[in-house]
């Protein structure tokens, strides 16, 4: 039985942390913009553009499973909640 040494490089850690940082920054900026903008069309387009930018960056930096799970948790769930809140308060 052979023992294979496993080396964890700093690059591996930074490539995992970078998408998480990008996710939280984009989500935070999107939430601030959505709260400040009251028009439905404008905030929807801002949300879509930031989500697309975020998805492209994250897709380049993570594995597909990490991409799917973290995108769902960090980006779409808060965006859906804010969208629902704004729609219900405007009626």
Swiss-Prot record:
InterPro entries, per database record: Papilloma_E5_alpha
Alphabetical UniProt keywords: Early protein
Pfam families on file: Papilloma_E5 (PF03025)
Protein origin, superkingdom: Viruses
Sequence similarity: Belongs to the papillomaviridae E5A protein family.
Name recorded for this polypeptide: Probable protein E5A
Originating species: Human papillomavirus type 6b
Lineage of the species this protein comes from: Viruses, Monodnaviria, Shotokuvirae, Cossaviricota, Papovaviricetes
């Amino acid at each position: 039985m052979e023992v294979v040494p496993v080396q964890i490089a700093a690059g591996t850690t930074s490539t995992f942390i970078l998408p998480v940082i990008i996710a939280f920054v984009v989500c935070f900026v999107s939430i601030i913009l959505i709260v400040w903008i009251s028009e439905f069309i404008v905030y929807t387009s801002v949300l879509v553009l930031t989500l697309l930018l975020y998805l492209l960056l994250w897709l380049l930096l993570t594995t597909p499973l990490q991409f799917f799970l973290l995108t769902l948790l960090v980006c779409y769930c808060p965006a859906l909640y804010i969208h629902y809140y704004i729609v219900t308060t405007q009626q």
